[in-house]
Amino acid sequence: MRYMLMMHAPRGNGDWAVMNWKPEELKAHIEFMTTFNKALKASGQLVGAEGLAMPSDARIVRATSGAAPAVTDGPYPEAKEFLAGYWIVDVGSPEEAYEIAGRASAAPGPGGTPLNMPIEVRQVMSGPPPVD
């Protein structure tokens, strides 16, 4: 079963609180994520993973009745959290996906304290939902 694990990060001053961390704190966080991803890859569980650009670089695109789509800034600046990155994992049970998400959530933050970031876990559909 494939699951998408979506890491939600808190906003800080500006886009992302991590931008206010000390260099050694940011380095420890990146090293944790690198080691975490390598372990998932070595176990054969990692399908893909990516970090995402800052919310200020995001755009919302909608179809219009005209030829060109409407492109606006987004997501909303008043949001307290934003999608910072994701993993797609292939595991045998939901519990395995939850365990992986729990480890990701504990990535170190300021002072080395675990961030306890919210990680949303959703199964990737293998086909369309059943229709009665």
Range-by-range predicted roles:
Residues 1-132:
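Conserved, structured core segments of small domains
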